[in-house]
Amino acid sequence: MGYNIPRGTQDILPGESDRWQFVEQIMRDTCRTYQYKEIRTPIFEHTELFARGVGESTDIVQKEMYTFEDRKGRSLTLRPEGTAAAVRAFNENKLFANPVQPTKLYYVGPMFRYERPQTGRYRQFYQFGIEAIGSKDPAIDAEVMALAMSIYEKAGLENVKLVINSLGDQDSRKSYREALVKHFEPRIEEFCSDCQSRLHTNPLRILDCKKDRDHELMKSAPSILTYLNEESAAYFEKVKQYLNDLGISYEIDPNLVRGLDYYNHTAFEIMSNAEGFGAITTLAGGGRYDGLVEQIGGPEAPGIGFAMSIERLLAAIDAEKRELPVDKGIDCYIVTLGEKAKDYSVSLVYKLREAGISSEIDYENKKMKGQFKTADRLKARFIAILGEDELAQNKINVKDAQTGEQIEVALDEFIHVMKANQKG
């Protein structure tokens, strides 16, 4: 019997994986210039980490986690997001003791949520994320957003926008929660069951509801910005000032709260405006999470970060009809004629590869015409032709597939010639 992949997952096949590697390299190169270092955490963690870190009342914890028991009855969960695990690693490995702070981390890898699969949303999905832990400076907030926007710019995207908000400190949110309850309570029965249950547990999450987003009460909800105390308002003003100084355009959305419980002060999303991108326009999202480090067992250490969907980045590139510079083809394909030439080509192609020259030979015993077709399909820049006559004369014919020019080269000079003409 045949097998299919589980619903909500995908195979990333050769060709497409080149595009993934290209954008991932943009992410890694950008992190290097901003001095963020890679961290690799386990794909599964103790369930309690996400319950405490992400929030008991969130959709992620309530409905979407892949949780299982190991053979000793311990509850483990496939990671649904990256921040909680990064903070756990920060605490457990005492990264807070490093003399240079903040600790700047990035990660790339699969996450898992049991959601309804749709375009741009999978049950196994890939995220790139960064965390800056150990500083409560508005400048680091601006840096984090600048880094994200820089990645989209380097990927060639033009139709993106940064949307920001402030959730304020604990006192500001307390005042705002009271105002939200007062606003929603008279007609809360008109909302979905999830929003009704959140009214007195976490009313800010009502603003993040996808089902009721267009409800008139949602549109007329009070703005959190009017409930910021002096300190929180000043912090937000400083963040905006730095973004202005960096020349980064942004919009303010007072209903932007994000879907995780640990956010405070700065919250932001980056969205695609590309025509035909689809219903899910959010490319990345993040914010400040002061208090999370202490909440999961560490010292006082404020932090900020974001997560970026790699699938949605590639979808946005397609929506804007951008071509990534991948699939350049190989440097050289060796066409052989005769058994002795084939035997010699096995060691010759090995030497080419060891010299850093991408190259290939025939493994299907094709005739010469078939080998030339394979070279064409592989987009070989040079086609080296080796028969038994050439081998006896210690020579090889080299054809430039772009110009059609063909030259004869001594075998002991062949690798040097290929190296000199290698693709950039």
UniProtKB/Swiss-Prot annotation:
Keywords: Aminoacyl-tRNA synthetase, ATP-binding, Cytoplasm, Ligase, Nucleotide-binding, Protein biosynthesis. It comes from the Bacteria. Gene3D superfamilies: Anticodon-binding domain (3.40.50.800), Bira Bifunctional Protein, Domain 2 (3.30.930.10). Disulfide bonds: none annotated. GO terms for cellular component: cytoplasm. It is found in: Cytoplasm. It holds the Pfam family HGTP_anticodon. Its main location: cytoplasm. Signal peptide: none annotated. One of its GO terms (molecular function) is catalytic activity, acting on a protein. Its EC number is 6.1.1.21. Homodimer. PANTHER family: HISTIDINE--TRNA LIGASE, MITOCHONDRIAL-RELATED, HISTIDYL-TRNA SYNTHETASE. HAMAP family: His_tRNA_synth. This is Histidine--tRNA ligase. It comes from Bacillus subtilis (strain 168).
